[in-house]
Design a protein with these regions (language model features):
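Conserved GNAT acetyl-CoA-binding A-motif
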Residues: 102-115
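Short beta-strand-to-coil "C-cap" segments at the C-terminal boundary of structured domains/repeats
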Residues: 144-147
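A generic local structural motif
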Residues: 23-26, 63-66, 96-99
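Conserved acyl-donor/pantetheine-binding loop and adjacent beta-alpha core of acyl/acetyltransferases
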Residues: 32-80, 88, 136-140
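Extended, folded domain segments that form the structural surfaces/walls around functional sites
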Residues: 80-81, 111
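Short amphipathic alpha-helix that is part of the acyltransferase structural core
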Residues: 1-49
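Conserved acetyl-CoA-binding loop-helix of GNAT-fold acetyltransferases
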Residues: 83, 89-102, 124
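Conserved active-site alpha-helix within GNAT-family acetyltransferase domains
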Residues: 115-139
């Protein structure tokens, strides 16, 4: 298994859930220059990946001021972190995050989650809960990693 910078974004997007694809693919050209992607590859198959944004990502446009505040503090946004279904529960999300932290040492990251059951996963990986806000009545929790 290898951790690689993404060169095949469309290949990565194909492993994402349909609703995630619908939120990134149509606007990708607007974010490509300010976003890096990283993948876990096993036997020439993308098994996990995620995007690192240096400007407000498409799924956070409703909270653009919040995004700007984090970017102004030197944080990068992690989004679209995904492990394919058949490889779940093998610690690959943690492997992806560990490799990212090694690839970009001393970098601060922030992210949001809607699935609050992911709290334990992110805390286990060194992230700290900061606050919550609501988007269309749905709670989103903000987490940071301070490198």
């Amino acid at each position: 298994m290898t951790f690689e910078a993404c060169t095949d974004y469309l290949g990565f997007f194909k492993i994402l859930p349909k609703d995630w694809q619908e939120s990134i693919v149509p606007v990708w050209k607007n974010f490509k220059a300010s976003t890096s992607g990283y993948l876990l590859i096993d036997n020439n198959q993308i098994i996990a990946g995620g995007l690192v944004f240096s400007k407000c990502p498409p799924d956070m446009l409703y909270a653009e001021n919040e995004s700007k505040a984090w970017f102004n503090k030197g944080f990068l946004y992690l989004g679209f972190i995904y492990v394919i279904e058949e490889k779940r529960h093998q610690n690959l999300g943690s492997v992806w995050l560990d490799n990212l932290k090694k690839r970009i040492p001393n970098q601060k990251f922030w992210l949001t989650i809607e699935d609050l059951k992911l709290d334990a996963f992110y805390v286990k990986n060194g992230f700290k809960y900061v606050k919550s806000f609501y988007n269309d009545g749905i709670e989103e929790a903000v987490y940071t990693f301070e490198g």
